[in-house]
UniProtKB/Swiss-Prot annotation:
One GO-annotated biological process of the protein: aromatic amino acid family biosynthetic process
Functional summary from the UniProt entry: The AROM polypeptide catalyzes 5 consecutive enzymatic reactions in prechorismate polyaromatic amino acid biosynthesis.
Entries under Pfam families matching the protein: DHQ_synthase, DHQS_C, DHquinase_I, EPSP_synthase, SDH_C, Shikimate_DH, Shikimate_dh_N, SKI
GO molecular function, a single term: shikimate kinase activity
Main location as per UniProt: cytoplasm
Organism of this sequence: Scheffersomyces stipitis (strain ATCC 58785 / CBS 6054 / NBRC 10063 / NRRL Y-11545) (Yeast)
Subunit structure: Homodimer.
Cofactor dependence: Zn(2+)
UniProt region (3-dehydroquinase), positions on chain: 1059-1271
Protein name as it appears in the record: Pentafunctional AROM polypeptide
Residues holding 7-phospho-2-dehydro-3-deoxy-D-arabino-heptonate: 128, 144, 150, 160, 192-195, 244, 258-262, 265, 281, 352
Enzyme Commission code: 4.2.3.4, 2.5.1.19, 2.7.1.71, 4.2.1.10
Length: 1571
């Protein structure tokens, strides 16, 4: 019989815990809870599991045996937090009523917290209360929601706001149910377990710390073996339940003690309310616990060690401790931007445990103990501080700052890391006290544990670290050792790694890696020395920096080791500490000059002596040390001295404020160089310093009386130079400056600290300049300090702890609050620094949150886009790699590196000759070596074009896959194979293929696929225009895959054309016409005649060749009304992944697919938007059925960008029901409509991305009722959705304007109820009064001369372009502001779009110059357009120079405008590639102007800068070919663009501003040109 543990709650043993106790559950319920009806309610996921089936079967058989007259009912609801709502509760109640359930009913809630909460609430209210049994199946439910009788549902305003206390008859925690739990849900539950131990039971917390590694290994396995941790798991659940049961028994209705269970929940619930359902409850509570623990530390109640210990424990269980953790951000995506302080505080203010609107928090006093056993009221100011990473430091208040203070800084980082290395290499047990608990030491401890270097535990509530060393017997591990930005740990472990033995169960290497900054910091000299001594170490990325791959089992040879030690003393300490374990005694000789930071080398030697190894300094050689072989013997106790570098901050505070501060445990006998700071720096600056062997006291002079130091050599204490710099900033004595030298190594720390100090001191109005090995600071009076601008982001810390702490001191001397970024970076050495500033020094501190406009979607792109990371291009020879790589490099501003050229340089001959002499096998070997080296050498700012056969070699393939795995882009380019064959057959410059080209492709096809994460298929180009279009579509593709431009979901009425063709080749020429009026175009992959990857890629190429619209990539399965087989999940997943590789803007993802498949696609989506879709093919679901809400919620929970739901209308009413549903479904953009003839109204009413058809598109089975854009607009107008509007062209003359032709043709094509007419006037006031004020149907104006400036005063707001250009050509009503008007300028768009449509590529990263000819109003728009296109310099040429001088004066300096006012100026000008002619075409051209222009045309035509034919755009559209166009094209072979194109392109933009619809390009173009 399986053992069952019973826990008493409210006086009865009703909580039963065990493993596999289904028999016990059934027996207890049927025997002790007599009923005519038992109802088991679960969710659809749980209903399919083995443990549930077992419970159900046992219940059915036992009921027949014990109570044959009773019945058993089952009901399943949809899973997920979003279904814990009123609708689902009502559906369960309706079921119970329909089944005739009465007051004696017993309900069993079998499921996670959602089921337990909601079904408990059903039981509380059904028939005014029936009995309920909780059978929790998730860890979270077992230890939290099922115990204590709290029941509830969620509302749109928050979680659990409607509910009741309703105690269950039993709670059965059967731990075997956890076998069904996904890993993330398992980990999620541990947050509540850790919380319970943290508030109540330190002994249990210690056990949990030890259990974490085993737990995580088991639950993360593909098939978790819970039996292997059965006893510990049961104990984990049991102990957590015991605490909660005790607390609930003492305070059932949560009036006092029970509030303690809400530790982490005040902040956690607020975060969850914003991030649900993407973030889980336990994840949010985990973050909440750390934030509330930091609050307790900030208030001076909780020790920094306890916070560190709690954080480490949560991380050990795989839980997040910060919203900005990489893995957590992946889950919540863009929702991260919704986590704003004001929103969180509002959520906290309506928390159920508050006293009115006063926010209450549980304050932790120690691990296992809460402060005063109750929740406390906390201020919003203190909460704001802990919730933000940016901080406002208020001016120091003389009345509040204590005159004397005693501060004990955390343990020394330098000594802490050395002690951990020595203890791990030593034998015996050592108790380390005052260890620094920071990011650096955390990484070191984790690394030592991973390498089995020592067993590590804690005592004294975490204050003492107990290390039992294994005598240097470390072994390799599978996982990479991630060291964050911990420079000390990385350098020490680099020497430890070769000593590591090989673990037969894992690999033969140790990999050391870190964050982005760590991967820039130098480690080369240390690696060189170790390699020379027999170690095998490879750089995995950038030469000279982490990550490193170190061969285990090699050891150190010993003997003489030479090391360059002028950059970092840590290199020296690293080898010193590991030297006793070399094969021979070591002589370490430091070469290259005087070693840096000699005192830190002395510190290492002194510590080695304490651990039993004596180092002797050579008497014959300078900077040389002899280290004997041996083994460290750990002392019984080792006390870490406080960090002397950190001590400089409180001492400097005293110096700056004229107060006194004592550091009681650092004095003249310190091992640390920085202990001399007070004596060598602060005393000569005017401070009174008293230093004993063990303490230091500084008393500052009165404020403003510090003296500059003409020169101080800080080489013995380089880290303290930042503190000295901020003190020197307010040390003024005439013109005397302070010069600090000996600190060159500070340029390669967490950032370039010298440059950082210069740039940030400047924000305070303090001038500083760099010296070859230091900094010079020109101090000013504190009264003259400037407050750095908060709007300009205040003080940048460069994620450097010492920069942040230093400037927190200077900030308080300003007259106003100073913003300091990234305050959490101080966690590296002093996590509680801000708490000290607040509690000890009584400094007022506020949290600060960046205004939302700074954190828009582009900020996310910058964070997660490709950035400067190099892009690797692979593909068949002849696939266009060279051309497209060149285009890509030009667009991105990258360097193009052809690996064939790199290879030829290395082998000293051309590839063809090498292959003839050495053979293909040797060539592939050399190619793989060059590839691996190049991927590291050219890791940033390059496009690497590879040879076609790079995928032939396994080693090269592994290098490519590794690059993809590390987050890089490997782009596979391909084109039609027949075209490739034709091209290659004619190419004699490259070595001949051994096989036929098609055979080669078939062999390589899968290799290309598995080695790349992106794929672009080039359509065949048969004309110059098609070639230009290919370049533009390829650039758009690159923008998408690099995150440079992310598709924006339309916010207004919009459409997409759904293509149901089997092959787009047949309709390519009609695609632009077919997609008229659409905002996107859908490729139905399942309807294609074949779904091979090549054919699907070819179809996307046809789309890109034919239209610029975003692509929606859809594969509909048979059960969802499509043609793709239902059961081919593997093939389906590959095709979905192909869509992402092809860089489509939208991917349709069916909600009925397996959950793991959905999650894999969502994880890999990159910058593609996901449309989560569900189609009710049967037509049986009405829109008030809860299943629709469940499907919508499922899409929201998955984190899709849009949700698409398709029903079938069996009656007209179904359309109205859908609109009710739409009105309540607002969490994510929704596309929802009904198919069928009776469903047409729903398509008309759908506001966003409605699918449309076209006369040329074949009808699709099951899609009856499809309409085209014009039909929808007509119907929408008829029912009042669109109303009549009037638009005008205003100015004088307007009689010949083509604008009415353009706009009216568009209205007619799209069936819009609008009219565009002419209104001739020279009076802007008349136009405003008669057209805008008096016409109730006013839609908008197109403004021409002479009103473009005069009309501006009648607008309420101007666009950026209108402001800069100083003219308006479009007026519309401001959205949502009736009677207020926006002035816009689309002339510049007409100019830039004319160039772009003609094939001019993006010029942002290309050194291209432009010229504007003329000085009128259009010239201003032309200047703006050329700047937007990316021209680096804009020249201007005009007959009347004063006019263009005026334009030059009015434009910002960054436009870089130069005037060509003489032939000499023209001769001196750089080549020009783009010209806009804005002079009248109907008058003779001035001869002098023409002479200058022709010189420009000649030079530009010869130079051909930018990789395209130089182009001239004519602004005049009459005559069709102007004299300037003729000269440019015929005489100088420039490409010319007629003015009618500019008219059309500005009109198209104007059309969209006026109507919100995409103009039908061909139709309006024809109306302007041919009518």
């Amino acid at each position: 019989m399986t053992s069952v543990e019973k826990v008493s709650i409210l006086g009865a043993e009703t909580i039963h815990v065990g493993y596999g106790i289904q028999d016990h559950i059934v027996q207890e319920v049927i025997s002790h809870l007599a009923s005519s009806t038992y109802v088991i309610v679960t969710d659809t996921n749980m209903a399919r599991t083995t443990p549930f089936t077992k419970l159900r079967n046992k219940f059915e058989s036992k009921l027949k045996e014990l109570r044959p007259e009773s019945r058993l009912l089952f009901y399943s609801v949809s899973p997920g937090e979003n279904n814990k709502n009123r609708e689902t509760k009502a559906a369960v109640e309706d079921f119970l009523l329909q089944q005739g359930c009465t007051r004696d009913t017993v309900i069993l809630a079998v499921g996670g917290g959602v089921i337990g909460d909601m079904i408990g609430f059903v039981a509380a209210t059904f028939m005014r209360g029936v009995r309920v049994v909780q059978v929790p199946t998730s860890l979270l439910a077992m230890v939290d929601s099922s115990v204590g009788g709290k029941t509830a549902i969620d509302t749109p305003l928050g979680k659990n706001f409607v509910g009741a206390f309703h105690q269950p008859e039993y709670v059965f925690a059967d731990v075997s149910f956890l076998e069904t739990l996904p890993t993330r849900q398992f980990i999620n539950g541990m947050a509540e377990v850790v919380k319970t131990a943290a508030i109540w039971n330190e002994e249990e917390f210690t056990r949990l710390e030890k259990f974490s590694k085993k737990f995580l290994a088991v639950v993360s396995a593909k098939t978790p073996d819970l039996i292997s941790i059965k006893e510990e798991l049961v104990k984990t659940v049991l102990e957590s339940i015991r605490v909660k049961a005790f607390v609930v028994s003492s305070d059932e209705k949560e009036t006092g003690l029970r509030n303690l269970l809400n530790f982490g929940h005040t902040i956690g619930h607020a975060i969850e309310a914003v991030l649900t359902p993407q973030a889980l409850h336990g994840e949010c509570v985990s973050i909440g616990m750390i934030k509330e623990a930091e609050l307790a530390r900030y208030l001076g109640v909780l020790s920094p060690v306890a916070v560190a210990r709690l954080s480490k424990c949560l991380v050990a269980y795989g839980l997040p401790v910060s919203i900005d953790e990489k893995d957590f951000l992946k889950k919540v995506g863009n929702k991260r931007h919704n986590v704003e302080i004001d929103i969180l505080l509002k959520k906290m203010a309506i928390d159920k445990k508050n006293d009115g609107s006063k926010i209450r928090c549980v304050i932790l006093e120690a691990i296992g103990k809460c402060y005063q056993l109750k929740a406390h009221q906390v201020s919003k100011q203190d909460l704001s501080f802990v919730l933000t990473d940016e901080v406002l430091v208020h001016p120091f208040d003389d009345k509040l700052i204590p005159k004397t203070n005693v501060v004990i800084p955390p343990g020394s980082k330098s000594i802490s890391n050395r002690a951990l290395v020595l203890a791990a290499l030593g034998t015996g047990t050592v108790r380390i006290k005052n260890l620094l608990h920071s990011d650096d030491t955390k990484h070191m401890l984790e690394a030592v544990a991973s390498l089995k270097g020592a067993s590590i535990s804690t005592e004294d509530n975490g204050e003492t670290i107990v290390v039992t060393g294994n005598g240097g017997k470390l072994v390799s591990c599978d996982e990479q050792l991630y060291l964050g930005n911990a420079g000390t740990a990385s350098r020490f472990l680099t020497s430890v790694a070769p000593l590591v033995g090989i673990n037969p169960q894992s690999g033969e290497h140790v990999v050391l890696t870190g964050n982005a900054r760590m991967q820039e910091r130098p480690i080369g000299p240390l690696v060189d020395a170790l390699r020379a001594n027999g170690s095998e170490i490879d750089y995995l990325n950038k030469e000279g920096s982490l990550p490193l791959k170190v061969k285990a089992g090699k050891g150190l040879n010993g003997g003489r080791i030479e090391l360059a030690a002028t950059i970092s003393s840590q290199y020296v300490s690293s080898i010193l500490m590991c030297a006793p374990y070399a094969n021979e005694p070591v002589t370490l000789s430091l070469v290259g000059g005087k070693p840096i930071s000699q005192l830190y080398i002395n510190m290492t030697i002194a510590m080695m002596k304490t651990f039993g190894i004596v180092v002797t300094k050579s008497e014959t050689e300078e900077h040389t040390y002899h280290i004997p072989r041996g083994s460290y013997v750990n002392p019984k106790e080792y006390v870490i001295e406080s960090d002397a570098s950190s001590a400089t901050y409180p001492l400097a505070f005293a110096a700056l404020t004229g107060t006194s501060c004592t550091i009681p445990n650092i004095g003249s006998s310190s091992l640390q160089g920085d202990a001399r700071f007070a004596v060598d720096v602060l005393r000569p600056m005017g401070c009174e310093v008293v230093q004993t062997a063990t303490s230091t006291t500084v008393t500052g002079p009165s404020v403003g009386n510090l003296k500059p130091l003409p020169h101080v050599d800080m080489e013995p204490m380089t880290d303290a130079f930042l503190t000295a710099s901020v003190v020197a900033a307010v040390a003024k004595n005439g013109t005397q400056s302070t010069s600090i030298t000996g600190i060159a190594n500070q340029r390669v720390k967490e950032c370039n600290r010298i440059a950082a100090m210069v740039s940030e001191l400047a924000k305070f109005g303090v001038v500083a300049n760099e010296l070859p090995d230091g900094i010079e600071i020109h101090g000013i009076s504190p009264n003259d300090l400037v407050t750095p601008s908060t709007e300009k982001r205040g003080i940048k810390t460069f994620d450097d702890h010492r920069v942040a702490m230093s400037f927190s001191l200077l900030a308080g001397l300003c007259k106003d609050k100073v913003l300091i970024q990234e305050r959490s970076c101080t966690g590296k050495t002093w996590p509680g620094w801000w708490d000290i500033l607040h509690t000890k020094f009584k400094v007022a501190i506020d949290g600060y949150e960046l205004p939302l406009q700074h954190e828009d979607s582009t900020a996310l792109v910058e964070k997660h886009g490709n950035g400067k990371r190099s892009i690797i291009v692979i593909g068949m020879r002849g696939a266009g790699k060279s051309t497209l790589s060149k285009w890509m490099a030009s667009f991105l501003g990258f360097k193009l590196v052809d690996l064939d050229d790199v290879l030829e340089e290395k082998i000293g001959t051309d590839i063809r000759s090498f292959v003839q002499q050495q053979g293909w096998e040797e060539f592939r070997k050399q190619e793989a070596i060059v590839a691996k080296e190049s991927f590291i050498k050219f890791s940033e700012g390059c496009v690497l074009s590879t040879g076609g056969g790079i995928v032939e070699g396994e080693e090269a393939r592994e290098s490519l896959k590794s690059y993809v795995k590390s987050g890089g882009i490997v782009l596979h380019l391909h084109r039609d194979l027949d075209e490739t064959v034709v091209l290659l057959s004619a190419d004699t410059t490259r070595p001949a293929y051994v096989d036929e080209i098609k055979q080669v492709w078939l062999r390589r096809e899968n290799w290309y696929r598995e080695c790349s994460n992106y794929h672009f298929y080039s359509a065949h180009c048969s004309s110059d225009a098609e070639f230009k279009h290919l370049r533009n579509s390829f650039t758009t593709y690159i923008k998408t895959i690099t995150g440079f431009h992310v598709a924006q979901i339309p916010k207004k009425r919009s459409f997409y054309t759904s293509l149901t063709f089997s092959d787009l080749t047949e309709v390519a020429s009609s695609l632009e016409d077919i997609s008229t009026g659409s905002d996107a175009i859908e490729l139905r992959v399942d309807l294609l005649k074949e779904t091979t990857h090549t054919f699907v890629a070819d179809q996307t190429a046809i789309l890109r060749k034919s239209t610029n619209l975003p692509i929606i990539y859809t594969i509909r399965t048979e059960s969802q009304g499509g043609k793709f087989p239902d059961n081919k999940f593997e093939e389906l997943e590959e095709l979905l992944a192909l869509g992402i590789k092809l860089g489509v803007q939208y991917l349709d993802l069916q909600l009925d697919l397996p959950n793991d498949l959905l999650e894999r696609i969502l994880e890999s989506k990159k910058f593609t938007k996901i449309i989560a879709s569900y189609v009710d093919v049967s037509g049986s679901l009405r829109w008030d059925n809860v299943e629709w809400k469940n499907r919508y919620n499922q899409g929201v929970s998955l984190g899709a960008d849009l949700v698409k739901l398709v029903g079938r209308a069996n009656s007209f009413q179904d359309n109205l029901s859908l609109e009710v549903f739409r009105g309540t479904s607002t969490l994510k953009p929704l596309i929802a409509y009904n198919v069928g003839e009776k469903g047409k109204l729903s398509r008309v009413l759908n506001p966003r991305l409605t699918p449309v058809t076209h006369a040329k598109i074949p009808a699709e089975s099951g899609n009856e009722g499809a309409l085209d854009v014009a039909q929808i607009n007509k119907a929408y107008t008829d029912i009042g959705g669109l109303s009549e509007k009037h638009f005008w062209i205003v100015g004088n003359p307007v009689g010949h304007s083509r604008s009415p032709n353009l706009h009216n043709a568009g209205y007619k094509k799209l069936n819009l109820p609008y009219v565009f007419d002419r209104f001739e006037t020279s009076d802007a006031g008349e136009a405003f009064q008669k057209l805008i004020k008096e016409d109730k149907n006013f839609g908008g104006l197109a403004v021409t001369m002479p009103l473009k400036v005069d009309i501006m005063k009648y607008t309420d707001k101007l666009s950026d372009s209108a402001q800069v250009i100083g003219a308006v050509n479009t007026v519309i009503e401001l959205e949502g502001e009736q009677g207020k008007y926006l002035g816009e300028n689309t002339d510049w768009v007409g100019i830039s779009e004319s160039f772009v449509r003609d094939g001019i590529p993006n010029l942002e990263n290309v050194n291209v110059n432009g010229l504007v000819v003329g000085g009128g109003g259009t010239s201003r728009a032309a200047v703006y357009a050329l700047h937007q296109l990316g021209c680096k310099k804009i020249y201007m040429l005009n007959r009347t120079v004063s006019k263009i001088q005026e334009i030059q004066k009015n434009f910002p300096a960054e436009y870089n405008i130069e005037i060509l006012d003489s032939v000499e100026a023209v001769e001196a000008a750089q080549p020009i590639s783009l010209i806009v002619s804005c002079i009248p075409a109907d008058k003779p051209i001035d001869e002098q102007l023409l002479n200058k222009l022709e010189r420009v045309l000649y030079v530009g035509g010869e130079a051909k800068i930018g990789g395209f034919t130089p182009s001239l755009l004519e602004a005049s559209y009459k005559p069709r070919v102007t004299p300037i166009m003729k000269i440019a094209s015929e005489k100088y072979e420039w490409n010319v663009i007629p003015g009618v194109e500019m008219l059309v392109n500005q009109g198209i933009t104007q059309f969209q501003l006026h109507t919100g619809f995409v103009a039908p390009y061909d139709v309006v173009h024809d109306a302007v040109v041919n009518q």
